[in-house]
């Protein structure tokens, strides 16, 4: 079992049950999935960009990546319907907890000038989104083998009913919020 999942079951869930005054342990908010998305506007001119992004995201997550395609043609962005414009991957269960553990203990401390995560990046329903400016903060990516620095979006979907419950859950996981 993943280290963070065990910590959640034995320490975090009982603590949150008391803190949020819930009657049943199944009511305690939990992380259901983590979605990583890489929007690749530069892929319009060069199809190799998608291949490199797929390889990077597969190394980071250890899971097959899905290529996302444009839904509509937009002349201003020089995009046609059906063209590949991004890659994404959804992590659940064990892989999700293992990724979260690596993110908190290894990757975030490697970010340059890191002052903490913004505590206001919740969506109103307890889900948290954050952006990473460069993929080299992950230990799986070899700096010498990348073609370009690319950012990615990380979204944590939780069962929390509101932002306060979601914030309490992520604070219990020791997320380094700055405010």
From Swiss-Prot:
Any single GO BP term: translation
GO cellular component terms, semicolon-separated: ribonucleoprotein complex; ribosome
Pfam assignment, any one: Ribosomal_L5
Keyword Ribonucleoprotein: yes
Lineage top rank: taxon: Bacteria
The entry's keywords: Ribonucleoprotein, Ribosomal protein, RNA-binding, rRNA-binding, tRNA-binding
Molecular-function GO term, any one: tRNA binding
InterPro entries according to UniProt: Ribosomal_uL5, Ribosomal_uL5_bac-type, Ribosomal_uL5_C, Ribosomal_uL5_CS, Ribosomal_uL5_dom_sf, Ribosomal_uL5_N
UniProt xrefs under PANTHER family: 60S RIBOSOMAL PROTEIN L11-RELATED
Family per record: Belongs to the universal ribosomal protein uL5 family.
Subunit structure: Part of the 50S ribosomal subunit; part of the 5S rRNA/L5/L18/L25 subcomplex. Contacts the 5S rRNA and the P site tRNA. Forms a bridge to the 30S subunit in the 70S ribosome.
NCBIfam families: PRK00010.1 (NF000585)
Function statement: This is one of the proteins that bind and probably mediate the attachment of the 5S RNA into the large ribosomal subunit, where it forms part of the central protuberance. In the 70S ribosome it contacts protein S13 of the 30S subunit (bridge B1b), connecting the 2 subunits; this bridge is implicated in subunit movement. Contacts the P site tRNA; the 5S rRNA and some of its associated proteins might help stabilize positioning of ribosome-bound tRNAs.
Record protein name field: Large ribosomal subunit protein uL5
UniProt organism field: Pseudomonas fluorescens (strain Pf0-1)
């Amino acid at each position: 079992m993943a280290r963070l999942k065990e910590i959640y079951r034995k320490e975090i869930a009982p603590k949150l049950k008391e803190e949020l005054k819930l009657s049943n342990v199944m009511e305690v908010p939990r992380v259901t999935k983590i979605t990583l998305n890489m929007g690749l506007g530069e892929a319009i001119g060069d199809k190799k960009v998608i291949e490199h992004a797929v390889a990077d995201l597969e190394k980071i997550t250890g899971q097959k990546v899905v290529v996302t395609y444009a839904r509509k043609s937009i002349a201003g962005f020089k995009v046609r319907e059906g063209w590949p414009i991004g890659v994404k991957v959804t992590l659940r269960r064990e892989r999700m907890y293992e990724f979260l553990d690596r993110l908190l203990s290894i990757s975030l401390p490697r970010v340059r000038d890191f002052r903490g995560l913004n505590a206001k990046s919740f969506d109103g329903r307890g889900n948290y989104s954050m952006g990473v400016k460069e993929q080299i903060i992950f230990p799986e990516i070899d700096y010498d083998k990348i073609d370009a620095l690319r950012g990615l979006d990380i979204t944590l979907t939780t069962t929390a009913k509101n932002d306060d419950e979601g914030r309490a859950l992520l604070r219990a996981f020791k997320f380094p919020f700055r405010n």
